[in-house]
Structure formats: structure tokens, C-alpha cells
Amino acid sequence: MYKVVMIRHGESEWNKLNLFTGWTDVDLSDRGVEEAIWAGKKLKEEGYTFDVAFTSVLKRAIKTLNLVLEQMNLDWIPVYKHWRLNERHYGALQGLNKAEMTERYGEQQVLLWRRSYDVPPPPLEKTDPRWPGNDPRYALVPEDELPLCESLKDTEARVVPYWADMIVPAIKEGKKVLISAHGNSMRAIVKYLDKMSGEEIAKTNIPTGIPLVYELDESMRPIRHYYLADEDFLKAKEQEVANQIYKK
């Protein structure tokens, strides 16, 4: 049996303001820092250790990972950063308030943008400063791979190959792997591992700052998964994510 641990970054400044974030490179909030520190302490208390870590190129995931590893005295392990683990790109919605968009477009439309599998948000123009092609960190990424917006289906299409090509080989080598990522890049992995339908993944909310453990068999199929948190705490955190369309 193999194990892999995933964690969604701690609360970001834009999570706190209830804004669509996507690839916008915002920092952790004070609460997000506390969540990451708590996660690191929890993993250490539960006896976890890691040989290698993977994260995105966005600072909220990178800083979460750094804080977790610091609490575990594992600052020295190899860390691989890749844009394919980035959050889903929310296109023209990035920087807009979720509750205000609900008032403007209706709850059903915003739920489709946030939680459906194959409905993308409104796209950016390439002249928009929010387009990743205008950010030097993506200079080596082929232009046709840089999104103007993404559905969860699009996100899965870029995340799963990275999982298969980079993360799975490390797991099969017997390395203890930690992934620090984002709500939708994690939902993409969860959907793939658990063979969930679009309807099932639409109901799945990933809370910030709580380690999610997957136990995998020799074929990298899930045996079981669980969060390192008690049920009441977990439910409250999941409900926070679900309620974002109402909170200004």
C-alpha cells in the first residue's frame, strides 16, 4: 500500500475577501498562515514524514508548503513547482466578488461557473494583464497551453498528466509524497482517482489547510481516503467553501 498526502493552501487574502482568484498570485491571509502551521503540526503529531513535495507556481500554495515543512523540520526535502498544479483559471471572473456575481447573474449561473465539470467562466482577452502570457513565470510555457479561462474539465486535462508523469513515479519508488495545491487542482486529482462523475465532483468541496490522505494500491487506485481532522471541524470548513456564493 502507498500513501500520498494533499493539502489545499491556507486561506488567501482573496479567499478572505471572497473573490474569484484563479491564477492571480495572492498571498496567504493571517488565518491562512495559521492553518498551514496547524497542518504541519498535525502531520508531525500523526507521525507523517515526507521525502519529496510538489506544488504550483503560486505563492499561496508555495508558502503553505514551506510553513508545513518548517513545522515538520523538513525544509530540506526536494520541492518541485509546476504551473500544471495551479488553481483553475477563472478567466474574466478573476478579482470579482462571488456573492456580487450571484446577485448579478443568479445562483445557478455562478454555481455552474464554480462547481460544474465542463462549463467555463467568461474568457479573458490576450491583451488583458490577467492573461498568463503576460506573466514572466510562464515564459517557457507554449502559448497555446496558457488558458484564457478553464472549466474543471480543462483543469483536469493539465493536472492529471502531471500526476501520472511526475507524482506517480515518485510514489511507486517508495517516496513519501506531499502535494500543496489548490481547491480545483485537488478536485481534478480527486475526481480522477475516485472515478467520479461530473455531478459527483460538483458536490465536492475541498477545505483550506486540512491534510487529505489517500491510500493507494499497487495500481495507484484508491483504497480509502480521509482528512486529518475530526468530523465536526471538517464539516464546518467544507460548509465555508460551499457558502462563498452568499458571503460578501
From Swiss-Prot:
Enzyme class: isomerase
UniProt cross-references to InterPro entries, sorted A to Z: His_Pase_superF_clade-1 (IPR013078), His_PPase_superfam (IPR029033), PG/BPGM_mutase_AS (IPR001345), Phosphogly_mut1 (IPR005952)
One Pfam family of this chain: His_Phos_1
GO biological process: one example: glycolytic process
Pathway participation: Carbohydrate degradation; glycolysis; pyruvate from D-glyceraldehyde 3-phosphate: step 3/5
Reaction(s) catalysed (UniProt annotation): (2R)-2-phosphoglycerate = (2R)-3-phosphoglycerate
Domain of life: Bacteria
Ligase recorded as keyword: no
Keywords attached to this entry: Gluconeogenesis, Glycolysis, Isomerase
Binding site for substrate: 8-15, 21-22, 60, 87-90, 98, 114-115, 183-184
The keyword Isomerase appears for this protein: yes
GO molecular function term, any single one: phosphoglycerate mutase activity
Gene3D superfamilies: Phosphoglycerate mutase-like
EC number(s) reported in the record: 5.4.2.11
Annotated catalytic residues: H9 (tele-phosphohistidine intermediate), E87 (proton donor/acceptor)
Site keyed Transition state stabilizer: positions: H182
Family to which this protein belongs: Belongs to the phosphoglycerate mutase family. BPG-dependent PGAM subfamily.
Free-text function comment from the UniProt entry: Catalyzes the interconversion of 2-phosphoglycerate and 3-phosphoglycerate.
Protein's recorded name: 2,3-bisphosphoglycerate-dependent phosphoglycerate mutase
Gene name of this polypeptide: gpmA
